[in-house]
Amino acid sequence: MTEEAGKFPFTRGVYPNMYKDKLWTMRQYAGFTSAEESNRRFHYLLEQGVSGLSVAFDLPTQIGYDSDHSMSEGEVGKVGVPISTIHDMDLLFKDIPVEKISTSMTINSTAATLLALYIISAEKKGISSKTLNGTIQNDILKEYIARGTYIYPPNASMRLVTDIFDFCSTHAPKWNTISISGYHIREAGSTA
C-alpha cells in the first residue's frame, strides 16, 4: 500500500502539501500574574506575528483552586495566569480574534473546566465552538506518573479525558483533544 500525505492513515501527514502551503503554528508559552497582564502579552505576541497562543496557567488553576482559596496563598500567578471564573477567561482573551487563531492550553486535571470557560467566552462574543481551533493538553496520566497535580482518582480522571473527546467530536470538531507530553514522564525516570 502506498501511503500519501493528506490521506488515511495519515502517516505521511494530515495535509497533502504539508508545510509547503501552510507553515506550522508559531506560538510562545505565556501566562503572567493576571488575566489582564497575560492579555497584554498575547496582544504583543500577535503583533509580532505568532499564529497561535499558548496559555500557561498558575498552579492553583492547574489543581482546581480559586485564587482566593486558602490553599492558593503564595501561588497565585507565580507560574502562569490565574483563571477562576468566566470573567477571568473573558479578560484573558479580550479583543483577541479566537476564531482566527489557534489556542493551546497546557492544562490537565482541570482541562474540562478550562475548555468550557474558553468555549463560553467565545460564544459570548458570538463565536461558535465549531469554528474554534486549538489544543488542550488533557494528559492526565502524566499527572499521576510525573507531576502529581491530579485531583480525582484515575478512573474519574480518565472519564473526564474521554468526555472531552466525545464533546469536542460534536461541538468543537477543529479542537485537538489531547496532547501527550512525554517529557515529564521521561524526566520522572521512564526508560522508554
Residues of each region from the PLM?
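Catalytic alpha/beta active-site cores
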Residues: 1-192
